[in-house]
Amino acid sequence: LRGELERNDDWGVIRLFPEPSVIPQLTVQLTILASDGRELVVAAVVRAVTGETMGSSVYRDISVNDDYTNDKTDPFADLYVTMVNDIVHAVSSASHQETYLRSLSSLRYASELVPEAFPDYLGQEAGLYSVRREPSREDPMLIRLNRLQDYELLFVDTIDEQLANVSREVSDAYYL
């Protein structure tokens, strides 16, 4: 799925977070329900940092012998294309601006680390978050929290790169 999102080229950086995070403006939570090499069943939930569920589906694909050729194409690539198309549709119908979601993400991150730092800036009603007002870009606390967020992203990127390397190293075993 990640490769297909990157090929789509509409998303910016695609990261794999080891656990739920408020840093990304958009998350896709995947749960593998079945996977035996022939069948893949995946539940996908797309959420904005607002807490809004933008889409939720269960996807199923059954591979055929022709899917396992020597060209190293993932046998479930068509499933990933369908998932990305559904994500694009869900996101394109949403009303949120990217800058708003980025501000909301920053405030939610700040609220998780230091709840008393910006108590009146973030609103929450019925499980949905909103920006009530924004702190100054020169706010010293916000600057420090943004620096921490950058460090966390660097850590996630390092782990992500290591996982990608391991995946490349073992992938040949799947294409015998």
Give residue spans per PLM region.
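N-terminal segment of the mature soluble domain
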Residues: 1-22, 53, 82, 86, ...
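Generic structural signal for short, solvent-exposed loop/turn connectors between secondary structure elements
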Residues: 19-25, 35-40, 71-74
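Amphipathic beta-strand/beta-sheet edge segments enriched in Tyr/Trp
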Residues: 29-67
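C-terminal/domain-edge helix-coil "capping" segments
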Residues: 63-176
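Acidic helix-start/capping segments at beta-turn-to-alpha-helix junctions
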Residues: 17-32, 103-109
